[in-house]
Amino acid sequence: MIDMGGASVQIAFEMPKTEDFVSKDVFEINLGPDGSQNDFNYKIYSTTFLGYGANEGLKKYEASLVSRGESEDSCAPKGLSKTIGDVSVKARLFLKTLNFHRMKFQGSGQWDKCLTRLSSLIDDKTEPACSEQTCFLGYVPAPTFNLSTVQLYGFSEYWYTTSSFGAGGEYDFEKFTSEVRKFCGKDWVDIQVSRIRLFKMYFGFFF
């Protein structure tokens, strides 16, 4: 399973019995009736990524905009203006600066540019370099087997976000990307109108 909250991201999955990866994030549990049957023995990898939750991720992104001194926000809808200034200590350390001032930004709704910007924030330079062959996010030691062979279930923000774009259920990258790209190309005024219409429909359902 993978779970995204406001401050962190968690992941937990069963490792293959042939995987010999050793770490403080690996736990062995036995679900047998008396804990002695090997058929019920499971090796679980579980870790958390502090600072990669939805809220902290947004703060890091906004801090990067402020540090660059840019007025365009490619991740915000066209027509949306917002003021950014106060960011978390974690975000400031991530960007290696403590000097911030309030700035006003204008959304441009550019999906590809937004994706590039967000991807550049994944590598946390405040964490020590990882010495293992495989590492999550560049600094968390991880097993070497292909994670795409693991069936993962997304919770919290993963579910909320995909469901909001009609892409819930089994994850389909192409479908989800297509829906988000279309949404990002909309004007803020149109998004607000759609939200009001949806609220009225939802409210009318009960009355």
PLM regions: where:
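Helical "lid/coupling" subdomains associated with nucleotide-phosphate turnover
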Residues: 1, 9-207
